[in-house]
């Protein structure tokens, strides 16, 4: 649907208000609710599933080492309004159709509060999954300042629940961040980017079968689809919004919350975007971009300087297609900045943040090394199933790092596409990438490299929890598995892949 662009103002997510707060802890109650919200001036209200009635949900702000507790409450209907495939793993008919569980993405969190897919719960906790342990989640927030996000992670339903609107920001701050000369308060804005398809009545559309499925196909109906690309782009819950800004520097925390789509972002006036942080916090030094690629679940913490563009408009654009070439009338556009607000007070002319260097990588000193391959097969209906190391979700656990150990993971991607790989619990670092011959690999299983090791680009040299594993490459990452033991997961963050079956349990053992 080609709606008029830049007619709705960008909403700024509200900050969550705690129910209780004392020196020992901060306690929130956040409900998942079905609401109807206006996403565009010319559309009727859209049915959405939200946290506390808004998309994005309320932003939780925490200081480092502040203990936060959240009671996530499912107040959703008993029937899903998007097409549920009961044939994929854990889609059992004897379980509630609507299941939820919340994962703090990038959070270093005890296993019982991590949002394990089988720790799901139904409305008012009437039914719970086999790994359910607690109604109130605990977040210690021992991490450095970083931009995290929370979203649904229910088994076999993540793609639908997140598409319905279950996502929000979680920001951790610390004394080091506060010492930097960065834009703050109203000049520090989170941007949640997602793609959707709408019907004429404003309803969300999500396909019930893969494209070009014959009418007489024996595929289940509904059936999971291998990917989803919407032609309409939302930022903070509005379609192609605009933001009025002052001629000064702004900090934007950009999150790709799309199911499948990777964006290649740039400004239409070719202005430089200064990146200061990635998934797990600040980079060792700032990086200047003319454009950058951001895959599902990745975060880019950036500064845009509008001081030279008073009374001008600038459009944040996307040059990456999704299943087809980008359309200049639709998905090539993200949002518009109008530099029309008068400058309030004094704005810093330059930024002089002194960032901390990260410790050197020492892969040779790792306690263990694993080689893990992104693979796939077909189910009995001929549908693709993407896998991690040829293992299904229900197969025995094979990734079992010892608590406190350092491991190197060699992630081999012989598939034809990029997969954003996410590890729970840890913030890892990228060692290098190396291209290999996928044809030889597919025929013999042998990895024959076609080029040298390539150091990660500057923007990937910080702490990451999600990394783009490109086709025809081996990417090496290194992580220390601390500070909690227990059951976690790692998976592809293309949600249609994660739900079937590109996700594996991971046990951190004592």
Curated annotation (Swiss-Prot):
Binds 4 copper ions per subunit. Optimum pH is 5.0. It is an enzyme of class 1 (oxidoreductase). Residues 45-79, 99-174, 242-317, 372-506 form the Plastocyanin-like domain. The keyword Oxidoreductase applies. Its cofactor is Cu(2+). This is Laccase. It comes from Bacillus stratosphericus.
């Amino acid at each position: 649907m080609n709606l008029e662009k830049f007619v709705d103002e960008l909403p700024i997510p509200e900050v969550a208000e705690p129910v209780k707060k004392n020196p020992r802890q901060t306690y929130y109650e956040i409900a998942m609710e079905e609401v109807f919200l206006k996403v565009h001036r010319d559309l009727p209200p859209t049915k959405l599933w939200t946290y506390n009635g808004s998309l994005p949900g309320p932003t939780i702000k925490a200081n480092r080492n502040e203990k936060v507790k959240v009671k996530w409450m499912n107040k959703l209907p008993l029937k899903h309004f998007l097409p549920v495939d009961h044939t994929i793993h854990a889609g059992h008919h004897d379980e509630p159709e609507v299941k939820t569980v919340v994962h703090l993405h990038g959070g270093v969190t005890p296993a019982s509060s991590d949002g394990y897919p089988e720790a799901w719960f139904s409305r008012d906790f009437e039914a719970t999954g086999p790994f359910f342990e607690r109604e109130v989640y605990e977040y210690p927030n021992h991490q450095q300042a970083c931009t995290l996000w929370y979203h649904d992670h229910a088994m076999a339903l993540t793609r639908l629940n997140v598409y319905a609107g279950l996502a929000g920001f979680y920001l951790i701050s610390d004394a080091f961040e506060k010492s930097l000369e960065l834009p703050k308060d109203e000049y520090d804005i989170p941007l949640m980017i997602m793609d959707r398809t709408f019907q004429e009545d404003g309803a969300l559309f999500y396909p019930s079968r893969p494209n070009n499925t014959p009418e007489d196909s024996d595929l289940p109906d509904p059936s999971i689809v291998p990917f989803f690309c919407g032609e309409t782009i939302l930022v903070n819950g509005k379609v192609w919004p605009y933001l009025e800004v002052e001629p000064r520097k702004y900090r934007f925390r950009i999150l790709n919350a799309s199911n499948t789509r990777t964006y290649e972002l740039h400004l239409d006036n070719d202005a430089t975007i200064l990146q200061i942080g990635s998934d797990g916090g600040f980079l060792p030094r700032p990086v200047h971009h003319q454009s950058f690629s951001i895959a599902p679940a990745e975060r880019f913490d950036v500064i845009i300087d509008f001081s030279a563009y008073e009374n001008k408009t600038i459009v944040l654009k996307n040059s990456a297609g999704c299943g087809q070439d980008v359309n200049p009338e639709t998905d090539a556009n993200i949002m518009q900045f109008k530099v029309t607000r008068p400058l309030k007070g004094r704005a810093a002319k330059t930024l002089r943040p002194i960032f901390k260097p990260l410790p050197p990588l020492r892969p040779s000193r790792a306690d263990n090394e694993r080689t893990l391959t992104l693979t796939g097969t077909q189910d009995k209906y001929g549908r693709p199933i993407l896998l991690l190391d040829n293992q299904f979700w229900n197969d025995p656990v094979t990734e079992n790092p010892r608590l406190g150990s350092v491991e190197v993971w060699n992630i081999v991607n012989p598939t034809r596409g990029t997969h954003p790989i996410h590890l729970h619990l840890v913030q890892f670092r990228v060692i290098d990438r190396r291209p290999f011959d996928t044809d030889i690999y597919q025929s013999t299983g042998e990895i024959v490299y076609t080029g040298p090791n390539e150091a990660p680009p500057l923007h990937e040299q910080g702490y990451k929890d999600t990394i783009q594993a490109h086709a025809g490459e081996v990417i090496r990452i290194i992580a220390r598995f601390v500070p909690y033991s227990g059951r976690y997961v790692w998976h592809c963050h293309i949600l249609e892949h994660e739900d079937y079956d590109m996700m594996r349990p991971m046990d951190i053992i004592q």
